[in-house]
Every structure is written in C-alpha cells, then in structure tokens.
Amino acid sequence: MASEVRFEPGLYRGAAGYYERFRLPYPGAMIADLARRAAPSGHGRLLDLACGTGQLAFPLRGWFAEVWAVDAEPGMTEVVRAKAAAAGAAGIRAVTVSAEDLRAGPGRFELIVIGNAFHRLRRPLVAERVRGWLEPGGWLALCWSTSPWAGPRDWQQTLDRLLRRWQDVLGTSGRVPPGWDRPGRTVGAVPVRDVARRR
C-alpha cells in the first residue's frame, strides 16, 4: 500500500535496556479500564503485539492464564524473558517475530493489545490477522499515549529543536518517516474505535 508509513528495520536495535528503564508506564487506571471492558475469563490468552519490554503484558497478566509477548526486536523479548523469570510469571511467553509474521491459530486470544506501535505495522495486514486470532467476543485494544516531550511549552519546543539537530548530526533524521505520529482513524476502510470487539 503506497500510503503506508515504513520504518527502518532495526529501529529499536540496542535500545531495550533504555526502553525498559525510561519508557513511561501506562496509567493503572487505563489498565483497569481495559480489563473491565474486555472482561477476561481468567483462563484465556492475551496477545501483546510489538510488546517492547512488556509495558502492557505485565500489568495485564493477572487477568489471563497465558500471555504472548511478541516483538521483532530480540533485545526486547530478552528483557521480557528476564522480567518474567524474576517475577515468577511462568504464563508469559516471549516470542521474537514481527507482528506480520506471527503464526497463531484462529480464535486463540481473548484480548489483543498493541501499545504505541500500530503506526509502525502493516496495518491492513495486521488488522486482518488480528480479527482471525481473536476468539468470538474477543477484544482488540490499540493503546496510545502522547509524548511528554512534545507540546507547546518553551522547554518542549527547545527539546524538540535539540533532538532534531542531533538527529541531523548523527545522520538518523530519516530513520523515522514523516507522518508516523498521525496514524489516522481508519484501518483500510474500517473506522477505528477506542476498543473493538469481535462479534
């Protein structure tokens, strides 16, 4: 699809430790609201696509018997494995594969979450596969946050200019394509809601 935004492969290579340490967590109220809406059985599966270091998988794990934490970056899934071992979270399965290449049977998941990553995926393909992976009555949640660094305040504008200047100096300004932060409100021709349920 010509209008799709493409990200450089390996964009997060080597960043897992920093991502785990500095990535802001999702608010507890959001996690609780998501669990309330999806009303998991406690016996089902959660799929966290493009999971990073498990910012959604870990806080949601208590509502599921099994959690698949999937990310294309090996460093991210290594951190997930280490965190799961340290927490004694045997139900968390870290899988190193892209969302587009994941092989999962139909109707396997009660809830699928994608946190701050749907814009980086091949959206129509992933949306189609997600629909098949959800069990009847299952839910898809596209979780999003805004950057605390972006905004109209003087310090935010100054930081933005500084980051852009360093991107130019380091030759990385083209790694993130323009428009990545405006994913739109549709997937193909399907409107996106806050939380979608498979009927």
Give the ranges of each region predicted by the language model.
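Class I SAM-dependent methyltransferase SAM/SAH-binding core
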Residues: 47, 53-101
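Residues lining the SAM
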Residues: 114-115, 143
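N-terminal, positively charged/glycine-rich alpha-helical extensions of SAM-dependent methyltransferases
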Residues: 1-15
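A short acidic, Gly/Pro-enriched loop at the edge of an enzyme's catalytic core
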Residues: 103-112
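A short, conserved alpha-helix within the catalytic core of class I
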Residues: 121-130
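Conserved alpha-helix/loop element of class I SAM-dependent methyltransferases that forms part
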Residues: 24-44
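Class I SAM-dependent methyltransferase Rossmann-like catalytic core
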Residues: 13-24
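Conserved catalytic/acceptor-binding region of the Class I
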Residues: 131, 135-199
